[in-house]
């Protein structure tokens, strides 16, 4: 019997102001853990899988139940330790310490590979936490919509003189992360064709308004794209097909998209990528019989897809890796020039990271969408001179369906995060908001990740693989008084390729919370400015100077 599978479970977080725990500082992590497993949020909630292949919220259902039980009895001077999704200890700390400290999927470097992890996983000794799955701050596909939108806008500026109208994007994957690309693309003015092998995922994205139409053949999908481009109204199409097949067929036909990328779960060749010619059912059987054969077949198909991406790049498509490590997988399968197209961070996002700008997100524990709309207005009030941000907030309200607890994400940096958090806390205090707000971020941020094939690819000083930075980030956020802190390995790009940390803090309207919020939400993005300034980026050095950071070696 698989202790991780229970189709009878239907988890929905409590809403309103009635507490199940002893304070909001423990109620918040409990609700956010539950929200990660909401049926409208998680990819496979019955298996505790939130997103990203096998990114889980808890190691098994027994561990999940025990985490909830402990949070409900935890005092405000105690800290729960969670080791790879398992609650292993409660310790006396103090009221400004984190209520939960989480470590997921971490392995000694020599053993940091999928083979060793999968053995531990089968024995019930480990859990893959992805980034926000095991750190309980996943908010559905909205979580990366704005970052993806900003990337596509940057691509239009860089490649198409700022004009995306009449252009189209080819990509793959409609899981929790990939599902953001169709909506982000149409928001940025492109049409989008996304390949997906699992029809239930296409239907999920249709239901949550991330995809406009479904197609079952390439010809049908291309006709939809052509019609949209002719009409001037962008459309997103979910095509039921294998990305490797479609990408290669487009090369064969001589059809070149304007933008090419991919967000299948290529980071996990065993669980995340369907080989060409295989059905989902056959892949599930093969995973039980011969894992090595599955991995080999998946990597062979990834090689086909990456070769097609390179060919489309040569034909004129703006081509980028969107952070799923597909280039590495293809390289290991013999595609020697797999890295000839860039990752999206060095190509489009790094200047933002240099100013500590990244995916700031917040969640209304009340469950009331009005709380989010009020915070949207507060963001506009406090940041009046950023039309791109205002445009994003307007589009998000109009086009993004909340999944689970109402939430919002917007990319803001060092100079704004603490200001916004303190304003939200004041809104809770004076009753403008009906319940506390949880504030967090993705692990994909400026100072919280070491990932040489993604966030820290091609660093100016060659420090791509130095992972001291996310470790220091987690330690500093713990010392600063975050409500929960996490340290993970392997998120986004798979085992052996990344280390990263997460932070979440509660704005409960108290004066103590204001002190913690001011510290945490200054220090956290400041570590990103520090990291990039140390690597030699002038934008980061100037930001550090302007914001008065004390960086002794600069």
UniProtKB/Swiss-Prot annotation:
Source species, domain of life: Bacteria
Enzyme class: lyase
Disulfide bond annotation, renumbered to this chain: none
Residues that, per the record, bind NAD(+): 52-53, 130, 176-178, 196, 201, 242-243, 263-267, 273-274, 322, 492
Keywords, alphabetical: Cytoplasm, Histidine metabolism, Lyase, NAD
InterPro entries according to UniProt: Urocanase (IPR055351), Urocanase-like (IPR023637), Urocanase_C (IPR035401), Urocanase_central_sf (IPR038364), Urocanase_CS (IPR023636), Urocanase_N (IPR035400), Urocanase_Rossmann-like (IPR035085), Urocanase_sf (IPR036190)
Cellular component terms (Gene Ontology): cytoplasm
Biochemical pathway: Amino-acid degradation; L-histidine degradation into L-glutamate; N-formimidoyl-L-glutamate from L-histidine: step 2/3
GO biological process, alphabetically ordered: L-histidine catabolic process to glutamate and formamide; L-histidine catabolic process to glutamate and formate
Co-factor note (free text): Binds 1 NAD(+) per subunit.
Protein name: Urocanate hydratase
Annotated organism of origin: Shewanella halifaxensis (strain HAW-EB4)
